[in-house]
Amino acid sequence: MTLQIGVIGCGAIGQDHIRRLTRTLSGARVVAVNDIDPQQARDAVTKYGLDAEIYGDGHEVVAAADVQAVLVTSWGPTHEAFVLDAIAHGKPVFCEKPLAVTAEGCMRIVEAEVAHGKRLVQVGFMRPYDEGYRALKRVIDSGEIGAPLMLHCAHRNQSVGERYTTDMAITDTLIHELDVLRWLLGEDYVSTQVVYPKKTRHASSHLADPQIVLLETASGVRIDVEIFVNCQYGYDIQCEVVGEQGIAKLPDPPAVGLKHGARQSVEIMTDWKERFIASYDVELQAFIDGVRAHALTGPSAWDGYAAAVAADACVRAQKSGAVEPIAMAERPAFYRG
């Protein structure tokens, strides 16, 4: 069976997913598209040679009889309504982050999915599909380094635009760590604090950069995450897990080691899409396979809610300078195991 997908949102990430659905992945095809800019939807159909209907409203995509699953890649504040509509129609939905712009919105999606009685939602957190993170989790789960005690992490971007704001260091950047570190450790966060080192001269006047986010988990693991979005030298993701009897480190992407002119060097990527391109392929293929097997296994609506609650607390901590609690609702039995 070829899964027939409707895409809501034909901007950069939407077109990137259309590209992989059309040219890279197997078992699915795009049969419907929508964008707030009709020309952008038409351009996507032309560019990728789609045999797809263009709809003027995203909810029409959800309701279309030939659409079996929905891909939501529209503007963040529209996500909640489209996901809730997909659940109401009983259609599986892959939603790029954020699942909703508030934790309350995420909880409404959780409650709707629980009421429906079957998992329909997968959230677009791709790092759990990165082979480096998967290898790191295998080491942690094996017990080889003992119980994790501390994590030292960094999320560095070469530069960001003028529209990037201090809170986006949490909601756009740290959000990936909030998801993947919770997945790595298999436990929730209980508190957070944000501290500000000396500001880089490369940051705009309205942006605090870098930032250090401190997290504590339910078992007492301490995590520090450096967020530095104007580091200049490249795109660099680091994660080191300190255990009771050893240390495990996220591997860097493979690159040619160069010895030349009395110097030794390794190239560093500058584009986040290049760093995680394989993960995007794997996560969307997992969604296709999960829908066809009637068993979604990727990041759930509950994972989207957990990330939103933690992000809200981190934003509060940015403003207060204090240790802020991260208080989640009780996990429904629907999402356990």
Curated annotation (Swiss-Prot):
<dbReference type="Pfam" id="PF02894">
    <property type="entry name" value="GFO_IDH_MocA_C"/>
</dbReference>
<keyword id="KW-0560">Oxidoreductase</keyword>
<dbReference type="InterPro" id="IPR023794">
    <property type="entry name" value="MI/DCI_dehydrogenase"/>
</dbReference>
<dbReference type="GO" id="GO:0000166">
    <property type="term" value="F:nucleotide binding"/>
</dbReference>
<protein>
    <recommendedName>
        <fullName>Inositol 2-dehydrogenase</fullName>
        <ecNumber>1.1.1.18</ecNumber>
    </recommendedName>
</protein>
<comment type="function">
    <text>Involved in the oxidation of myo-inositol (MI) to 2-keto-myo-inositol (2KMI or 2-inosose).</text>
</comment>
<keyword id="KW-0520">NAD</keyword>
<dbReference type="GO" id="GO:0050112">
    <property type="term" value="F:inositol 2-dehydrogenase (NAD+) activity"/>
</dbReference>
<dbReference type="InterPro" id="IPR004104">
    <property type="entry name" value="Gfo/Idh/MocA-like_OxRdtase_C"/>
</dbReference>
<dbReference type="InterPro" id="IPR036291">
    <property type="entry name" value="NAD(P)-bd_dom_sf"/>
</dbReference>
<dbReference type="GO" id="GO:0019310">
    <property type="term" value="P:inositol catabolic process"/>
</dbReference>
<comment type="subunit">
    <text>Homotetramer.</text>
</comment>
<comment type="similarity">
    <text>Belongs to the Gfo/Idh/MocA family.</text>
</comment>
<dbReference type="InterPro" id="IPR000683">
    <property type="entry name" value="Gfo/Idh/MocA-like_OxRdtase_N"/>
</dbReference>
<dbReference type="Pfam" id="PF01408">
    <property type="entry name" value="GFO_IDH_MocA"/>
</dbReference>
<dbReference type="InterPro" id="IPR050424">
    <property type="entry name" value="Gfo-Idh-MocA_inositol_DH"/>
</dbReference>
